[in-house]
Amino acid sequence: MQWEVVIGLEIHTQLATQSKIFSGSATTFGSEPNTQASLVDLGMPGVLPVLNEQAVRMACMFGLAIDAEIGKRNVFARKNYFYPDLPKGYQISQMDLPIVGKGHLDIALEDGTIKRIGVTRAHLEEDAGKSLHEDFSGSTGIDLNRAGTPLLEIVSEPDMRSAKEAVAYVKAIHALVRYLGICDGNMAEGSLRCDCNVSIRPKGQTEFGTRCEIKNVNSFRFIERAINSEIQRQIDLIEDGGKVVQETRLYDPNKDETRSMRSKEEANDYRYFPDPDLLPVVIEDSFLETIRAGLPELPPQKVERFQTQYGLSAYDANVLASSREQADYFEEVVKIGGDAKLAANWVMVELGSLLNKLGVEIDQAPVSAAQLGGMLLRIRDNTISGKIAKTVFEAMAAGEGDADSIIESKGLKQVTDTGAIDKMLDEMLAANAEQVEQYRAADEAKRGKMFGFFVGQAMKASKGKANPGQVNQLLKAKLEG
């Protein structure tokens, strides 16, 4: 039997506010346990929550960016459940009247096609604390620094049909919230976490199968692996005569499998009711228009502009626009270096390899956009060749200065003096007289490879400094003469 996969995602994004959603406590990551928890965060009697306006503003920014309906009147509700890191015994969230309603986000698939993914809703809520197991023998520690950190939970429609589509959607959300500046997107620190709802059904069937939720997956790679593992588990289970049970599961990356965590709760299990300590939030049109006017250029518009303005392919434009920092870096390089396609190649390939090797983001790149742009100018005016440019790039990455100073100090300037190149070629051909005779006796089909030998010898003789175009032109004339 052929199976169709149905995937919906819930993405929890920590909003980049300076203070928590209902208290004035700081949200800095990595502080000593329980040093950023106020009486409000601890759920002490008699204290009242005060809504952080910046969290509301950031949620509205996201809603406008995905062309969603904004709830002009939205209500906070208490989600009741018991867990050690939830001091109040309930979480303040939104249920019936969320701040962001239906919207959509377009994702680019591997074959270049665009698929629209529906967003059901996005609602504001507070994060819970964190249970600590590592440093406690036979017990669990509780860190409430994270309790009350503002979250925007983004709930998709079940529109994805493969793990790769799911990853593309998460990457698109990740890029969008970083472009907007509402979340730093640091998945390793838990700033963006994903719950994956997965089900299967016979191909052609319209009714959904029983879904399982994979909780708190925190990397693109693990999202793909977790979903594929769960898909295979459900297929094997059904084909062996079993039934999928609705439940919450955890992904174990070491064993590459999901395992049962608990039975999946429904909304009525949480006994939602409006929080009596918080008034409904009323959002006026003027508030939204101010936010709309301040929205930055978003990834889809940037991709389109990169293609039309710079003549880039759809693939290159998507890669370069995948983060706001990378897009800005690229445009700064183009502004100085002039050639967009050359700049795109160096940013994606050479700089990308360097960043991967160092394990850093582009905003920590050891080669600045000004340095790279300056080096590209020297390629374009034939001061250095593309091959020599790699040596210059390595030196810039090592902190040895800008391109001009490195070229000067290392004597890397390309030889463009026709007389000097002509003399060097004569000496090289004289040293390879036998190969010259073989070349002249060979038919046209074999000459191409043999010509490459002479080019290599010429570049070796010039220590890579001879202008490749001039070498090719003069060499061909000498060999054919």
Curated annotation (Swiss-Prot):
It holds the Pfam family GatB_Yqey. Keywords: ATP-binding, Ligase, Nucleotide-binding, Protein biosynthesis. It catalyses: L-glutamyl-tRNA(Gln) + L-glutamine + ATP + H2O = L-glutaminyl-tRNA(Gln) + L-glutamate + ADP + phosphate + H(+); L-aspartyl-tRNA(Asn) + L-glutamine + ATP + H2O = L-asparaginyl-tRNA(Asn) + L-glutamate + ADP + phosphate + 2 H(+). Signal peptide: none annotated. It is an enzyme of class 6 (ligase). The keyword ATP-binding applies. The keyword Transmembrane does not apply. GO terms for molecular function: asparaginyl-tRNA synthase (glutamine-hydrolyzing) activity; ATP binding; glutaminyl-tRNA synthase (glutamine-hydrolyzing) activity. Its EC number is 6.3.5.-. GO terms for biological process: glutaminyl-tRNAGln biosynthesis via transamidation; translation. SMART domains: GatB_Yqey (SM00845). Allows the formation of correctly charged Asn-tRNA(Asn) or Gln-tRNA(Gln) through the transamidation of misacylated Asp-tRNA(Asn) or Glu-tRNA(Gln) in organisms which lack either or both of asparaginyl-tRNA or glutaminyl-tRNA synthetases. The reaction takes place in the presence of glutamine and ATP through an activated phospho-Asp-tRNA(Asn) or phospho-Glu-tRNA(Gln). Heterotrimer of A, B and C subunits. HAMAP family: GatB. Belongs to the GatB/GatE family. GatB subfamily. This is Aspartyl/glutamyl-tRNA(Asn/Gln) amidotransferase subunit B. It comes from Pseudomonas putida (strain ATCC 47054 / DSM 6125 / CFBP 8728 / NCIMB 11950 / KT2440).
